From Swiss-Prot:
Chain intervals for the UniProt region annotation (G3): 81-84
Keyword NAD: no
Location of the protein in the cell: Cytoplasm
Catalyzed chemical reaction(s): GTP + H2O = GDP + phosphate + H(+)
Gene Ontology, cellular component aspect: cytosol
Annotated stretches, region: G4: 136-139
Family under the similarity heading: Belongs to the TRAFAC class translation factor GTPase superfamily. Classic translation factor GTPase family. EF-Tu/EF-1A subfamily.
Protein name in UniProt: Elongation factor Tu
Amino acid sequence: MAKEKFERTKPHVNIGTIGHVDHGKTTLTAAITTVLAKKGLSELRSFDSIDNAPEEKERGITINTSHVEYETANRHYAHVDCPGHADYVKNMVTGAAQMDGAIIVVAATDGPMPQTREHILLARQVNVPKLVVFMNKCDMVEDAEMLELVEMEMRELLSFYDFDGDNTPIIQGSALGALNGVEKWEDKVMELMEAVDTWIPLPPRDVDKPFLMPVEDVFSITGRGTVATGRIETGVIHVGDEIEILGLGEDKKSVVTGVEMFRKLLDQGEAGDNVGLLLRGVDKNEIKRGMVLCKPGQIKPHSKFKAEVYILKKEEGGRHTPFHNKYRPQFYLRTMDCTGEITLPEGTEMVMPGDNVTITVELIYPVALNIGLRFAIREGGRTVGAGQITEIID
């Protein structure tokens, strides 16, 4: 069968496999590529090539992740798989690999285990919109009632963490069976991919969201005015658009009179572009690195929020000792560095290096924040943790 030419016409979705250790996440990832490769939709990836995940650095944290890509009849997928539990926690909290949805793998022989629960909670905290369940190792369970019981437990667990437990697709299969070419189990992998295609929503494209650009640098051009440079995070900006300048306590409105990229003048800039924006009536000292330019009324500066964070271990270059309530590190949000005070959850005395915890943060001045924003926690110039905002308080 001739391989289809890779067309970029299919919508792109980022997904991953999550779940308890040894429940078959990597085997399933290999099985998906193997089954789809037979249909000319993927390159075959062996278990070993996925399991020996390369190290990546994200916000100063080293994470092992494997990236696999494949397509279905409807979509193109980038799929991330992590070998170790700690890698998952770091990956999900730092957003090293953004997930638009995930396949949670649970062994029918064990049912939901502690990490199954932890990964579902993390997926909820970091706003993974939908999960699909793959019940693995069903070829090792003879009792149909046992399968029913595991499915019921999974639905209850999903509902407990505010996922749609009643309607989430649950596919009963065997990743190893599919990898070994057993037709019955290959069909289950195809069924899983159909469920992923229909249940996991297409993510909104960054260009379709409202305009936002964190300011990296500012300079003035004699006779023309002030230019703010940075990478556009979301949306599109046109010459003549009104914008708001937020952060550091001084909010101001202005109009973009020029968009420049690689020394060329453009009519517009869009998400992902590194641009310089010429701003009308703004003095060079009224705007500085760390501020945010955005569409008026979209986002507000806040100083207090809740966040899900991962604190680096000593071996990862993090702290050697725990920290206690009222710890005051630097928070690196977009292009802004700001001191903040951490309040620990009630009953938590201290946080050890390697912990994953929910904290409340109060910054010393308001900064443009939104739910889902990722940040690094730094101390003395090194990264000691990373996290993302789950709730804005003030």
